[in-house]
């Protein structure tokens, strides 16, 4: 009996979608001033590098953003809905408790059958989802997977907390992964440390028809910074070692777009020149699970990321979770 040839997962297309409403730092400062909260463009840029963010209008849902990003990724990949045999949505802001946001996206796209589910790993979510889809494709359980990161984080922000409300935006990014004979995704590592849950969390829950606990995002910024740069540095080196490449071989580093300070510090630790780091946090702010696919899509469409190049994508977020995916484009 002939042995079945190993299949690999390769990125065939990408897409991104941002809400139409753009809120600059000056816009946000003016809005917060009506609440007697003081901030400014200079204060936000100096600490985060963020200059603006996109915010969804009331009534716009995560599944709607995800669907638009998915359609653009499918167009880019040249695939039809009936070719999609897996949909994974990474989100911490689902439309419903259930069904999954992925099921809603499947219905919106007119896709049928195939595994369809959500992954919740906050800002690491897209890397978790991509690794999951890669495993299914390698195992021969899927051939064409739609992997999406989508969030409306503006719905879980405390707009009276200057330390967090200026950091986040809404949006969605997606990739199509297709089975291929040659490796696209070379290696992936996922990790978590549940003892660090309280440094970044939204602890509310639904019970008996009411939201109980604190429904808003809370963050210990200094603890998150320290954890993020430590684990991402180690994860990058581990995933490169598994793939048999050096960090210097990476053409593009696409980390989770949390804060420009984290991005710059990580680049220095890895000795990756800043011109080889894709940075979109200035325009998008932190879009949680959407940040990595949005950044990848921007860099593919503006011509920076080219076929054949080596790209390292990294996520880090609440849980505390982190992970890396190394891919040949």
Curated annotation (Swiss-Prot):
The UniProt entry, under InterPro entries, shows: ACP_syn_III_C, ACP_syn_III_N, FabH, Thiolase-like
Q: Name one GO molecular function term.
A: 3-oxoacyl-[acyl-carrier-protein] synthase activity
Report the GO terms under cellular component. Answer: cytoplasm
EC top class, as a word: transferase
- Protein's cellular compartments: Cytoplasm
- What's the catalysed reaction? malonyl-[ACP] + acetyl-CoA + H(+) = 3-oxobutanoyl-[ACP] + CO2 + CoA
User: Could you tell me which residues belong to the region ACP-binding?
Assistant: 257-261
Q: Which Pfam families does this UniProt record tie to the protein?
A: ACP_syn_III (PF08545), ACP_syn_III_C (PF08541)
Q: Which residues form the signal peptide?
A: none
- Say which family it is in: Belongs to the thiolase-like superfamily. FabH family.
Assembly state and interactors? Homodimer.
Q: What is known of its domains?
A: The last Arg residue of the ACP-binding site is essential for the weak association between ACP/AcpP and FabH.
Name the PANTHER family on file: 3-OXOACYL-[ACYL-CARRIER-PROTEIN] SYNTHASE 3, BETA-KETOACYL-[ACYL-CARRIER-PROTEIN] SYNTHASE III
Q: Which HAMAP family match?
A: FabH
Q: What is this protein called?
A: Beta-ketoacyl-[acyl-carrier-protein] synthase III
Q: What is the lineage of its organism?
A: Bacteria, Pseudomonadati, Pseudomonadota, Betaproteobacteria, Burkholderiales
